[in-house]
Amino acid sequence: MSTPFKMERGVKYRDAAKTSIIPVKNIDPNQELLKKPEWMKIKLPASSAKIESIKNGMRRHGLHSVCEEASCPNLHECFNHGTATFMILGAICTRRCPFCDVAHGKPLPPDPEEPQKLAETIQDMKLKYVVITSVDRDDLPDRGAGHFSECVKAVRELNPNIKIEILVPDFRGRVTQALEKLKDNPPDVFNHNLENVPRLYKEIRPGADYEWSLKLLREFKEMFPNIPTKSGLMVGLGETNEEILQVMQDLRDNGVTMLTLGQYLQPSRHHLPVARYVPPTEFDIFRDKANEMGFEHAACGPFVRSSYHADLQASGGLVK
């Protein structure tokens, strides 16, 4: 009889060590992968001085960016523009979603000094718009909502003119309690990603629930009707276009006015494979449909991610 796998606290488990313990076994690391089309090939910028400056600034304050931890394909572009999405509550997630490159494991307790460190780093970077996200923290009674609130408070106190977008987890089973924690320090934009279609949730988002996520977006909007809510989806995981359109309609029915839609990319052979590459023309169709549904801002394109050019999208600019 094999010995049960035991995780050590504070250790990052990635790739096979992470996805091998997912109940739904649907990943074959030896299968042939789809070839990337030309439109999915990125030309990296020549200069990396700005990139290293941002990385060093985060290391200096002991902070993390989701750009690095999730291996975002837009890292070079965003860092070269002096923007980044900060990831609070550590870099170890209590979930093990097989599309995501963020490490799984038993996280360390939240750093009580992180809100102040975050505020000072943002001040040093002279940011006017910031996105703050986090790993899932199912180990915490409030799922990390109180820490989010403290971070928003600290950032505003030191940067009074800044616009803050928070990209939150689903606060598993604690939606009402989490929103109570957030109400004293609300953001300028509230973002929570549905990621994909409900039919594929068991494979793509183990531990999550489609209706929970809609409830979170709906209840925040009811609490703060004047603050825009936002959500993001990935395509290329086996869903149909009709299913994506239905999710978009569900978002509108629950008060969401900002949408991001991008191509899923496989972080490693131990993650879910890409089922198809969606051409740019189809993303244009999705954007047109989103506009017809009443989304005020819809960023749709192969490289769009939930916080990609978030400042531009929030101000009404075209992102694709």
From Swiss-Prot:
SUPFAM superfamilies: Radical SAM enzymes. [4Fe-4S] cluster 1 binds at C67, C72, C78, S307. Residues 79-296 form the Radical SAM core domain. Binds 2 [4Fe-4S] clusters per subunit. One cluster is coordinated with 3 cysteines and an exchangeable S-adenosyl-L-methionine. It is an enzyme of class 2 (transferase). Keywords: 4Fe-4S, Cytoplasm, Iron, Iron-sulfur, Metal-binding, S-adenosyl-L-methionine, Transferase. Its EC number is 2.8.1.8. The keyword S-adenosyl-L-methionine applies. InterPro entries: Aldolase_TIM (IPR013785), Elp3/MiaA/NifB-like_rSAM (IPR006638), LIAS_N (IPR031691), Lipoyl_synth (IPR003698), rSAM (IPR007197). GO terms for cellular component: cytoplasm. Belongs to the radical SAM superfamily. Lipoyl synthase family. This is Lipoyl synthase. The gene is lipA.
